[in-house]
């Protein structure tokens, strides 16, 4: 029984151990050039060194700031708009093509437009990431409102609630689980777009810029360390929103 409990507790780490083990075997066998595939230990040392000398830490913080800012802007735009669109089918149907069109357009294809509008700098990176995140959040919020319980809406109207009260006291709460789903998806989209923008839109800092610099200089341990940092950041942000969702909308679907 004790062994079974230990195995159950270790289960989430088995995939990580298997991945590191496979990486170690490939690096030790030298099937690939050791310069291109260093050992996990070298990548770990590069990660520790990057945080110790604060170079990687600074880029990490810059990417967090850009991701957080873009997500906040996306939420401020998409959540109220999604509630309004979802509560009025006529308005939603009239704008459905526009929303789906831009949602289906690769955000990277919008880089030139945002560069023209905002120039080279943080504004462009944050704006293009906010654009991508807002579309994901908007779709989820509108979907949550459209699938809200009709009985609660009718009950509010019978009791004399105005359209505004129904909008914010019924639809907003009914769509809250989908709002959090949209925010979780939105923060992932924001992070991806921010890192890609840092790589290709004239940036001097951030994890994306650090990745490109390491790749161009063939500093493979630093490149893998930055990939680890970006992956850890994405996982942590998703975990934070999932934890908040479980705490505050545990009643979802009940």
Q: What spans do the regions from the language model cover?
A:
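Loop-to-helix entry region at the N-terminal start of transmembrane alpha-helices
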Residues: 58-66, 116-137, 180, 222-226
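C-terminal transmembrane helix and the adjacent membrane-cytosol boundary/short C-terminal tail
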Residues: 89, 146, 177, 181-184, ...
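Non-cytoplasmic
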Residues: 30, 129, 182-232
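Periplasmic/extracellular loop-to-transmembrane helix junction in inner-membrane transport proteins
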Residues: 3-5, 29-72
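Transmembrane alpha-helical segments of polytopic membrane transport and secretion proteins
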Residues: 1-17, 239-254
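Short cytoplasmic-facing helical segments at TM-TM junctions of multi-pass membrane proteins
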Residues: 143-179, 211
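Cytoplasmic-entry segments and transmembrane alpha-helices of multi-pass inner-membrane transporters
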Residues: 80-115, 129, 139-143, 148, ...
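Transmembrane alpha-helices
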Residues: 127, 131, 164-196, 237
């Amino acid at each position: 029984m004790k062994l079974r409990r230990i195995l159950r507790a270790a289960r989430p780490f088995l995939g990580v151990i298997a991945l590191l083990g496979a990486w170690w075997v490939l690096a030790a066998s030298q099937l690939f050039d050791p310069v291109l595939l260093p050992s996990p230990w070298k990548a770990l040392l590069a990660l520790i060194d990057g945080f110790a000398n604060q170079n990687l830490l600074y880029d990490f913080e810059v990417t967090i700031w850009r991701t957080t800012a873009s997500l906040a802007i996306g939420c401020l735009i998409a959540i109220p708009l999604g509630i309004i669109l979802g509560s009025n089918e006529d308005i939603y149907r009239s704008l459905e093509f526009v929303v789906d069109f831009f949602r289906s357009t690769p955000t990277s294809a919008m880089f030139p437009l945002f560069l023209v509008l905002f120039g080279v700098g943080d504004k462009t990176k944050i704006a293009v990431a906010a654009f991508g995140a807002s579309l994901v959040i908007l779709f989820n919020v509108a979907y949550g409102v459209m699938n809200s319980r009709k009985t609660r809406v009718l009950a509010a109207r019978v009791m004399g609630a105005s359209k505004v009260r129904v909008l914010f006291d019924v639809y907003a709460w009914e769509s809250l689980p989908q709002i959090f789903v949209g925010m979780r998806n939105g923060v992932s989209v924001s992070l991806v777009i921010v890192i890609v923008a840092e790589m290709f839109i004239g940036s001097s800092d951030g994890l994306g810029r650090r990745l490109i610099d390491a790749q161009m200089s063939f500093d493979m341990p630093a490149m893998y360390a930055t990939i680890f940092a970006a992956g850890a950041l994405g996982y942590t942000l998703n975990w934070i929103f999932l934890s908040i969702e479980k705490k505050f909308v545990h009643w979802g679907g009940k």
